[in-house]
A protein has these predicted regions:
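C-terminal regions of RecA-like/P-loop NTPase motor modules
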Residues: 2-23, 36-39, 47-59, 71-161
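Walker B catalytic acidic pair
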Residues: 27
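Catalytic P-loop NTPase motifs of RecA-like helicase/translocase cores
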Residues: 31-32
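Donor nucleotide-sugar recognition loop
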Residues: 42
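Conserved H-loop
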Residues: 61, 66-68
């Protein structure tokens, strides 16, 4: 894999040439880092997140950073397993530094195929939980997905065949 320094060098070159519109890193925990003596994984991840935020500011280019979650949401007593901010794996720094935090959630993946409150069929329905948005609103956005094609489309409550 590569380091934040490797990414920084490439992004700054592209940025100076006016060719940097978005940086996507999939995913945070695969970034290589030299771990200092007595440094925790949380601290290493935090250092990388902070460096990527600084890069975003310097290059004037957004960074979309994909991160793994811990397993806490899977052990909650409610069967929905809806993610919350503290589910971000190995770093409270993500919560502090990120401008926006969005969780992708698919009820069907947890065996939930019908909304108990509304009766809506949830097969092929996903939700984006916008749990932090420094420059806008938070909330839930629905989408449709087709796992056969890994295709995401706009949400419409009426499904046509």
């Amino acid at each position: 894999c590569c380091t934040v320094g490797d990414i920084r060098a490439k992004v700054m070159l592209k940025s100076k040439a006016g060719e940097c519109d978005l940086v996507v890193i999939d995913y945070l925990h695969l970034l290589s880092s030299v771990r200092q003596k007595n440094e925790t994984l949380d601290q290493v991840v935090g250092r990388n997140v902070t460096a990527l935020k600084q890069l975003s500011l310097e290059a004037d280019c957004p960074v979309l950073l994909v991160s793994q979650m811990n397993r806490a949401c899977e052990t909650r007593p409610d069967k929905a397993h809806v993610p919350v901010m503290s589910d971000l794996r190995d770093s409270g720094t993500i919560e502090q530094v990120a401008d926006c935090v969005v969780f992708v959630y698919r009820p069907e993946k947890h065996g939930i195929t019908k909304d108990e409150r509304t009766g809506e069929n949830l097969v092929g329905v996903g939700k984006l939980y916008i749990v932090k948005n420094r420059n806008g609103a938070t909330g839930i956005a629905r989408f449709r997905y087709n796992p056969s094609y890994t295709k995401i489309t706009n949400y419409c409550n009426t499904v046509t065949s």
